[in-house]
Design a protein with these regions (language model features):
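Structural detector for internal amphipathic alpha-helices that build alpha-solenoid repeat scaffolds
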Residues: 1-21, 38-53, 61-62, 70-85, ...
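Acidic interaction surfaces
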Residues: 212-213
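Amphipathic alpha-helical scaffolding segments comprising HEAT/armadillo-like alpha-solenoid repeats
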Residues: 20-34, 52-65, 84-106, 131-142, ...
Length: 231
């Protein structure tokens, strides 16, 4: 199979190729989103991004079941483009889609200075909406659903790494106190604290008591990033 055919099979549509469908009604675009043809699903998802809140429910349903790369990417782009009306639905999908999420602390060091992109698809979409999602994400940390909390922490850490959200450190601290015996959440929380200069003392305190090598490595990384950002 030629490269172009492979991309078409995965639903690739070049920018601008959707123009012939632009005047279709919302219902017609929703039907495209349900098509058996991946290219049509991509077109439907792309155009629904400009139709606002009425599209959110259908895009979220499609995101749960879509297996092809390009329609899935376009669904995420449209949900992010619609913005705040997408947040609550995406929150419900944290930790639900796919199996790419971390299940244990990674022993592979993350060497970049930038905050790592979430591996969870819903979290990765939420971070594109930005600071508006933080209050709802922090609400997740009060739940008793570790898999969902795990992905919310990634999104909070990423968004807060861009600055202007120092008030959310207290929420992360409270989450730490609640889940400090959960290795995965502890690892992710120490990573998220790299986004907050005020967490330095807390991180340094745990540097001497943490005994999990992967988590200890993450504490050191967060301390290093904070000290670099303070210069």
């Amino acid at each position: 199979m030629k490269l172009a055919d492979k991309k078409a099979d995965r639903g690739f549509v070049a920018k601008g190729d959707e123009i012939n469908y632009a005047k279709r009604s919302n219902d017609e675009l929703i039907d495209l989103l349900k098509s058996r043809i991946a290219i049509e699903r991509t077109i439907g998802a792309r155009l629904l991004g400009s139709r606002g809140v009425v599209s959110v429910e259908y895009l979220l349903m499609a995101l749960k079941t879509e297996k092809k790369l390009y329609p899935r990417l376009e669904i995420c782009c449209s949900l992010a483009r619609i913005g705040e009306p997408s947040i609550d639905g995406l929150i419900q999908l944290l930790g639900v889609i796919g199996n790419n999420q971390h299940q244990t602390p990674s022993e592979e060091p993350f060497l970049k200075v930038s905050y790592p992109l979430p591996r969870d698809l819903a979290a990765r979409t939420i971070i594109r909406i930005g600071h508006a999602a933080l209050p709802v994400l922090c609400g997740v940390l009060n739940e008793d659903h570790p898999a969902k909390i795990s992905e919310a922490i990634d999104a909070i850490g990423f968004i807060c790494s861009k600055g202007g959200a120092d008030q959310y450190l207290k929420t992360l601290m409270a989450c730490y106190n609640k889940f400090k015996n959960n290795d995965l959440l502890r690892w992710k929380l120490f990573r998220a604290m790299s986004s907050f200069t005020e967490s330095l003392t807390f991180l340094e305190k745990h540097l001497s008591v943490e005994n999990n090598p992967a988590i200890l490595q993450e504490i050191k990384r967060s301390i290093r990033i904070i000290n670099k950002n303070k210069r």
